[in-house]
């Protein structure tokens, strides 16, 4: 079955392309991109190798990207087509297999439970304490990634952070600048003195920057382009992506491939499952000309080449992607139908076998109300999951990282996600984020940390059974991530549902306890090597526990062959979990 969403523009629809007002250090009114007086450039033809079948067996529709309507779909969120038209056989050769949706499940009597990271008790882990981190002259200050990036660099064996600073005397038109910090543990950070601007940790200035994406491209073969920056700069009505590259993340070179018109708070991410880059572009959509408010939404563009793609990126309704989901949480106080809730931003990254999406969901109020009432706008960070890098599933509408209602707390408002997250630190995932608080009428923006169990987004929980759909694999060693109070047993079935000899429930050695990488073995002594390439099903029998993930590894030590997101200590420098 082929799913297409036809794009249409109703005559009554009037749509605007606007910015995010006072989120950046420069503040000001909502900027508007004026209509262009020159014809749009011809869209590049999508190469045939960018569409087709993904490694996991998902077949992409012939119309790709899927066309969606900025009018009829504006408040419908998304519903992935591949959850209703699953492959007959799912290839699980890449990465740990997470139970964040029903893609892998044929039937179960277990219940899905969502889990949330805990804030580090010593937050914030990075605060504005330098003159060049001050914003203007009124006492506000900014030292946090505005997407930007926090990564672990396995080559240099250190945590690295690129963040936006207020700019101080180095600011251009009251815009932000880019600074660099580093750490040995991801918690305690230093701001080194660098040579770009003597005596400071500034690595990029001179443009009126807003959001920025810094990506350590661990699969890049050209060392001079291993670090990539997609910076939104130019100011109100002039925002463009500026694409820069670097060999070390300190000295940056402009590739002179600016994008077309976009808006602030636009970002970029890499989808390695299809080897494409995605431009996630903010677009405020005015659905009805009589409505004074706009709906915060996103536009989508992809290209296999970051430079060419950057030149062609343009925020326009023909690229409409999604707006808010119909069941988004609303502001507990300001709920006066002013356009909220809306999707403020989306950052995404490959983790194991899926794409993780971090949605900054705006719940209000508008900037003028924030100024009048001396409050901070309420953005909270939600999570979504994708298996194609375009379609997002969001079953859980609770915040992954929530604001604090205590006005004195560092995260009292306007939480924003950070590129690179999560980082894998042992059996934990590190999520970095920016948060804001008020000192009088001045916003203080700093960086925080939240920590989650590895693979810990969702578990199949309770007492019961779970049978997977038909799968194929290339490994031979079976592993699970589980917290088991009772016991867990695993059974291997053939394509017809019959137990494979030597892999029965009775022959499975009992798995107990809490382990993020527990090996499953059978008393028969058999490994799964004899079943490579064959279609099988897996049946789990769980008593009082939580099953987070499973995978079949070619290694007895359990490397999953999946993507390691922002990386971590003792992981492969190519960004893939392998020896």
Q: Which residue stretches match the model-derived regions?
A:
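Bacterial Sec-dependent N-terminal signal peptides
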Residues: 2-5, 12-48
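Generic detector of short alpha-helix boundary/capping microenvironments
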Residues: 7-9, 345
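Enrichment for repetitive, rod-forming helical segments
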Residues: 9-11, 235
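Beta-rich carbohydrate-recognition and catalytic domains
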Residues: 27, 46-344, 349-412, 426, ...
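Charged, amphipathic alpha-helical scaffolding segments
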Residues: 421-422, 431
């Amino acid at each position: 079955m082929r799913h297409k969403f036809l794009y249409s523009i109703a005559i009554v629809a009037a749509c605007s392309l606007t910015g995010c007002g006072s989120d950046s250090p420069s503040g000001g009114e909502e900027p508007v991109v004026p209509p262009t007086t020159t014809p749009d450039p011809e869209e590049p033809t999508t190469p045939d190798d960018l569409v087709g079948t993904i490694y996991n067996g998902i077949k992409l529709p012939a119309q790709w990207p899927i066309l969606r309507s900025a009018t009829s779909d504006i408040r419908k969120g998304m519903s992935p087509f591949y959850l209703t038209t699953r492959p007959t056989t799912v290839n699980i050769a890449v990465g740990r297999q997470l139970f964040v949706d029903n893609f892998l499940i044929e039937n179960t009597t277990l219940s899905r439970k969502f889990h949330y990271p805990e804030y580090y008790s010593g937050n914030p882990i990075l605060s504005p304490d330098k003159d060049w981190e001050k914003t203007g002259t009124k006492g506000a200050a900014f030292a946090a990634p505005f997407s930007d990036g926090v990564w672990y660099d396995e080559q240099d064996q250190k945590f690295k952070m690129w963040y936006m600073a207020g700019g101080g005397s180095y600011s251009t038109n009251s815009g932000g600048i880019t600074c660099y910090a580093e750490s040995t543990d991801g918690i305690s950070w230093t701001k080194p003195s660098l040579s770009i601007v003597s005596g400071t940790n500034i690595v990029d200035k001179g443009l009126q920057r807003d959001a920025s994406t810094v990506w350590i491209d661990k699969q890049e073969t050209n060392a001079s382009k291993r670090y990539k920056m997609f910076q939104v700069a130019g100011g109100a009505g002039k925002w463009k992506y500026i694409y820069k590259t670097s060999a070390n993340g300190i000295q940056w070179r402009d590739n002179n491939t600016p994008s077309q018109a976009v808006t602030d708070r636009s970002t970029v991410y890499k989808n390695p499952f299809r080897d494409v880059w995605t431009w996630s572009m903010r677009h405020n959509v005015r659905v009805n000309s009589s409505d004074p408010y706009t709906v915060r939404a996103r536009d989508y563009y992809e290209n296999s080449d970051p430079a060419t793609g950057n030149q062609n990126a343009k925020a326009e309704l023909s690229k409409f992607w999604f707006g808010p989901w119909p069941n988004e949480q609303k502001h507990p106080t300001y709920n006066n139908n002013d356009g909220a809730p809306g999707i403020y931003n989306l950052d995404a990254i490959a983790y194991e076998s899926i794409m993780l999406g971090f949605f900054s969901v705006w719940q209000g109020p508008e900037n003028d109300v924030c100024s009048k009432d001396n409050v901070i706008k309420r953005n909270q960070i939600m999570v979504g999951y994708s298996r194609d890098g375009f379609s997002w599933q969001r079953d859980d509408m609770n915040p992954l990282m929530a604001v604090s209602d205590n006005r004195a707390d560092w995260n009292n408002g306007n939480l924003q996600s950070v590129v690179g997250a999560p980082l894998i630190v042992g059996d934990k995932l590190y999520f970095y984020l920016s948060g804001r608080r008020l000192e009088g009428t001045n916003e203080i923006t700093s960086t925080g940390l939240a920590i989650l169990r590895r693979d810990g987004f969702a578990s199949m929980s309770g007492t019961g059974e779970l049978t997977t759909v038909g799968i194929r694999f290339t490994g031979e060693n079976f592993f699970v991530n589980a917290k088991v109070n009772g016991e867990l047993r695993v059974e291997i079935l053939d394509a017809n549902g019959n137990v494979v000899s030597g892999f029965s429930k009775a022959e499975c050695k009992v798995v107990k306890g809490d382990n993020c990488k527990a090996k499953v073995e059978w008393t028969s002594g058999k490994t799964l090597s004899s079943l490579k390439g064959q279609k099988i099903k897996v049946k789990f029998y769980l008593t009082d526990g939580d099953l987070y993930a499973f995978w079949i590894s070619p290694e007895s030590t359990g490397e999953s062959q999946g993507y390691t997101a922002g990386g971590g200590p003792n992981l492969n420098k190519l960004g893939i979990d392998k020896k």
